[in-house]
Amino acid sequence: MRMLEKGKLIVASHNAGKLREFDGLIGPFGFEVSSVAALGLPEPDETGTTFEENAYIKALAAAKATGFPALSDDSGLMVDALDGEPGVYTANWAETEDGKRDFDMAMQKVENLLQEKGATTPDKRKARFVSVICLAWPDGEAEYFRGEVEGTLVWPPRGNIGFGYDPVFLPDGYGKTFGEMTAEEKHGWKPGDASALSHRARAFKLFAEKALNVVSAPAE
């Protein structure tokens, strides 16, 4: 495992919601953080067929363009009744004809498909969020960290705090959707903690432990 040394770190994302979450997760570690959005760098075409491939495409492009290590996330919603869709195409399902993204439309699309399949009870609406974080260096070397969280899709959407599909995702064991949770509730992790809730926080926890050598408390 290649360790990440303190210094400048590029977050390879133009997604405002992801950038807010990364800012909260990376903040305690003392890196000089910038994003490809702030630097005006273009988004590479995500031509991969897995979360790992797309995360690498984004992180490597940012690392090569800036000369600094870059951190990216490729994430998505996988719905059991839809054979794992939308998966790596989660963001694509929200694309409109004018090139923008409408996640209200995307959530409705998922719900329509579930209704068509008769998936109206919680046991038929199981899903998971997946996040793969890629840390890439300008020389092309990379490390990967994967996090997943299981849950159930609810309808109608609940809450407007999060982004993307958060308002319809109810994580197992909780009474709030991600869209109803504060950032602290959703991520449920800070350096040294034993556990994390969200898929991105779980992936980031692995990144912190393996690439930054952060020691977490043992899980109870």
Swiss-Prot record:
Substrate binds at residues 13-18, 75, 163-166, 186, 199-200. Its EC number is 3.6.1.66. Its cofactor is Mg(2+). It catalyses: XTP + H2O = XMP + diphosphate + H(+); dITP + H2O = dIMP + diphosphate + H(+); ITP + H2O = IMP + diphosphate + H(+). Mg(2+) binds at residues 45, 74. One of its GO terms (biological process) is purine nucleoside triphosphate catabolic process. The keyword Hydrolase applies. Pfam families: Ham1p_like (PF01725). GO terms for cellular component: cytosol. Belongs to the HAM1 NTPase family. Homodimer. Pyrophosphatase that catalyzes the hydrolysis of nucleoside triphosphates to their monophosphate derivatives, with a high preference for the non-canonical purine nucleotides XTP (xanthosine triphosphate), dITP (deoxyinosine triphosphate) and ITP. Seems to function as a house-cleaning enzyme that removes non-canonical purine nucleotides from the nucleotide pool, thus preventing their incorporation into DNA/RNA and avoiding chromosomal lesions. This is dITP/XTP pyrophosphatase.
